[in-house]
């Protein structure tokens, strides 16, 4: 590849004695797997910068699925994520690693990702709002189109006083059943506008994104959620990502 691309490290693991195998999220090529030769060596100047949440400029070469990293430079310091914000960032990274195809352009999603990290880094409260916004952005970029404003089949506008049940690949239908797949019209209107003014609409957004993302994740649980359970003492008001 000629020229530099903006990128973030999603995940890295040791490879041989001195190298790293990295999953990158790049602006122009989407998710890339690159081998950073010698990056773990004593004299490597890459040790400090090939970390998650550090904005990078990178160059690589190669024609196979795994490229060879040629250069990497930090654009700025790593975004300061700590506590629940750090685990939320790890969740976002794992989500991208699991659902994005290799070497597919997601340039618009790249900026949604950057905005999500900036929101997490600048938040002194709950990460929930930023996470729901980003999950909905991922679904949109994956082509997961859902009409929150009209009843499937009839095409009638959603009423904020009625209850609707979600059916995968069909949408929402009016229903008297209240269960995990049921949403009020008010909650659907909030999802359509991506505005969650209260805890009720925010919880509904989380429930919907979990339902919608499940087919992309398969039956394998997210490791970041388990890490959150193990290492963070979670107050009642701080739900898992």
Curated annotation (Swiss-Prot):
GO terms for biological process: DNA recombination; double-strand break repair. It comes from the Bacteria. One of its GO terms (cellular component) is bacterial nucleoid. Keywords: DNA damage, DNA recombination, DNA repair. SUPFAM superfamilies: ArfGap/RecO-like zinc finger, Nucleic acid-binding proteins. Involved in DNA repair and RecF pathway recombination. Transmembrane segments: none annotated. The lineage of its organism: Bacteria, Pseudomonadati, Pseudomonadota, Gammaproteobacteria, Enterobacterales. It comes from Yersinia enterocolitica serotype O:8 / biotype 1B (strain NCTC 13174 / 8081). The keyword Ribosomal protein does not apply. Pfam families: RecO_C (PF02565), RecO_N (PF11967). This is DNA repair protein RecO. Belongs to the RecO family.
């Amino acid at each position: 590849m000629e020229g530099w691309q903006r990128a973030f490290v999603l995940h890295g693991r040791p490879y041989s004695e001195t190298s790293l195998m990295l999953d990158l999220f790049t602006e122009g090529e989407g998710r890339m797997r690159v081998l950073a030769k010698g990056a773990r060596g004593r004299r490597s100047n890459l040790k400090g910068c090939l970390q998650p949440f550090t904005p990078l400029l990178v160059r690589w070469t190669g024609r196979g699925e795994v490229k060879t990293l040629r250069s990497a430079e930090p654009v700025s310091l790593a975004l300061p994520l700590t506590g629940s914000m750090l685990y939320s960032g790890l969740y976002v990274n794992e989500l991208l690693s699991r659902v994005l195809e290799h070497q597919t352009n997601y340039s618009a999603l790249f900026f949604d990702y950057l905005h999500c990290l900036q929101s997490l880094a600048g938040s002194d409260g709950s990460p929930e709002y930023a996470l729901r916004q980003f999950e909905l952005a991922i679904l949109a970029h994956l082509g997961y189109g859902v009409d929150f404003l009209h009843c499937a089949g009839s095409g009638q506008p959603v009423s904020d006083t009625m209850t609707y049940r979600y059916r995968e690949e069909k949408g929402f239908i009016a229903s008297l059943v209240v269960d995990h797949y049921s949403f009020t019209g008010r909650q659907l209107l909030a999802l359509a506008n991506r505005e969650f003014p209260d805890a009720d609409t925010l919880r509904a957004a989380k429930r919907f994104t979990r339902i919608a993302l499940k087919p992309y994740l398969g039956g394998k649980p997210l490791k970041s959620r388990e890490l959150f359970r193990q290492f963070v003492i979670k107050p009642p008001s701080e739900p898992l990502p």
